[in-house]
């Protein structure tokens, strides 16, 4: 944290295919993040990653084939705000894998309606391939009960609308225990 606790940043040089998996290429990726803390509970953030990916399978969304090293770049800007018992967050992101451009945006609102009980709503848009317009939108509404710090019971309904595939609806429940 720098400048009177108003700025956070991170920068890294990375190499790897994932946890416990040897990297299949020699290139390094660079990544960075910058957070600006404004007016107490308002945050504006930006991040990026620039590097090379190694395809472990053929892509469903573009012409990247198994074993191919390809350009993998991402950037995002976002903001979050908390006021009393309400928290909101939104983020916009773009990516480029080889020559395929993608984009996404989401918004999330969480509001405490009773002690330890919160309502959650979100909208999530993803365009996996801007050229073919491979788009999906997810609408999510739910409730969660925090029965212990970092432990919750959650239920939510999701409606997923796909442009190139069928739509879907999901009703799910989750128990989260963290220590």
Where are the model-predicted features located?
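Transmembrane beta-strands of outer-membrane beta-barrel pores
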Residues: 13-17, 48-54, 83-85, 92-96, ...
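Repeated loop/turn-to-beta-strand initiation elements of outer-membrane beta-barrel proteins
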Residues: 5-9, 40-45, 85-90, 116-120, ...
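Outer-membrane beta-barrel architecture
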Residues: 33-35, 76-80, 108-110, 142, ...
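Residues that define the transmembrane beta-barrel architecture of outer-membrane proteins
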Residues: 26-30, 71-75, 101-105, 135-139, ...
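Outer membrane beta-barrel transmembrane domains
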Residues: 110, 116-154
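Aromatic- and glycine-enriched pocket-lining scaffold segments that form the walls
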Residues: 1-43, 47
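Oxyanion-binding "anion nests"
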Residues: 49, 56-98
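Outer-membrane beta-barrel "beta-signal"
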Residues: 36, 145-146, 167-179
């Amino acid at each position: 944290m720098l400048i009177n606790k108003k700025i956070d940043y991170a920068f890294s040089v990375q190499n790897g295919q994932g946890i416990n998996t040897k990297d299949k290429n020699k290139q390094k990726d660079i990544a960075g993040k910058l957070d600006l803390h404004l007016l107490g509970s308002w945050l504006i953030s930006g991040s990026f990653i620039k590097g090379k990916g190694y395809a472990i399978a053929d892509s469903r969304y573009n012409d990247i084939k198994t074993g191919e090293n390809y350009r993998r770049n991402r950037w995002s800007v976002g903001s979050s705000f908390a006021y009393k018992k309400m928290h909101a967050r939104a983020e916009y992101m773009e990516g480029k894998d080889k020559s395929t451009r993608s984009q996404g945006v989401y918004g999330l609102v969480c509001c405490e309606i009773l002690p330890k009980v919160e309502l959650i709503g979100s909208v999530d848009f993803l365009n996996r391939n801007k050229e073919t317009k491979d788009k999906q939108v997810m609408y999510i509404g739910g409730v969660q009960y925090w029965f212990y710090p970092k432990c919750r019971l959650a239920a939510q309904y999701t409606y997923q609308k796909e442009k190139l595939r069928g739509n879907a609806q999901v009703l799910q429940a989750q128990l989260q225990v963290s220590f």
